[in-house]
């Protein structure tokens, strides 16, 4: 198991590094112009459906089902179930892909209304979407076969597959874009071909694992029907999340040209700490809280939630402060080269600062939600999520004109804060969560250490020369932030460095 965790962790880290390199290259080649806007809208479309039907709701029902069949009935029964699921998924994905290709202008009329009337951007977005939409078919089947491999404890190929997405995207920028009139199309073809490569990789791994696949005729067996019934709650939850994403895209297209790209780059930077910390924390917490509640250990469940709250706040607060206070410096060092200008970095930095304000509360949503799921309550988080979507839409409409590209980012952060506050209030009201003595001691001190860090970063930035931030200046900001967060944190006994380093190591293992 340790070897498997190391393998997955290595591939995951490689994927993140290559993903950031891909974004740097895209920024250098496309910048924030109309081609970049059209490409990012076009990329969102297959990813929206992928997260809805592939990696999210489908895997939530498929992976537990095939794991149970594999361990109770053996490889032959698991193979039969996987074949049935593949046939059903391939049929629906193929139909969805064909319909998407036919009705692509209508889809983008809804998703990118701001492009309508701007013939160049709208036409380009339609053309790019038609190139990339088949990626949906390949990547959703890749997610299915990755679930099969994970159930068989074969983790490497599934973890390596996202690396291919980044490699093909980078290769298309380096070696195909120079020979095309529009580099956006080179990147779009790289995305689609990467889907084929990822599917080929996991199919090869399944054959190596001893599962001999045949493609059966389409049939809805009792097991498949049961799996789709179990998909329904997860599909609703995923739908709420993707509706939130869609609102941000729609509003972005209604803003001045370049806004979609600016929001994309800012969000990608914000997702780096969020993906490592929040997802890992939520994944690890749910089984622990469920186990305590099943045994009637409510006090232990509350302790688990308290320790998770502290650790997530301890890790996300300095990340949020660093990204918010030094947002311009982060964007300068990461993206200012090629077509991405210093002015683009200023605009993207403002959006990044607004996104970063919501980083801790978004992570805390991942902590509070298991408190409901572990008790069999899936509807309360869903209802709160719907209310948060409505608030996000309202705030977007209020902010879009005065704040431009900062508006969607700030609306996302504020609606996430509303979501987290509602989850906390209901858990507390139902006596399912309350701060214990250790949390009451630590949390104010963590916040105070964060305030000291913010003041120090702000002061040092005032002393730096104007203009694009250099790498030495950026490293100075990182050093100052670290010293003025960890120093007060240790002195105030909010945490100690050994505990902090231990949390980072555990987060990496759980993220893997």
Predicted regions and their residues:
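Membrane-embedded alpha-helical bundles of multi-pass transporters/translocases
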Residues: 1-512
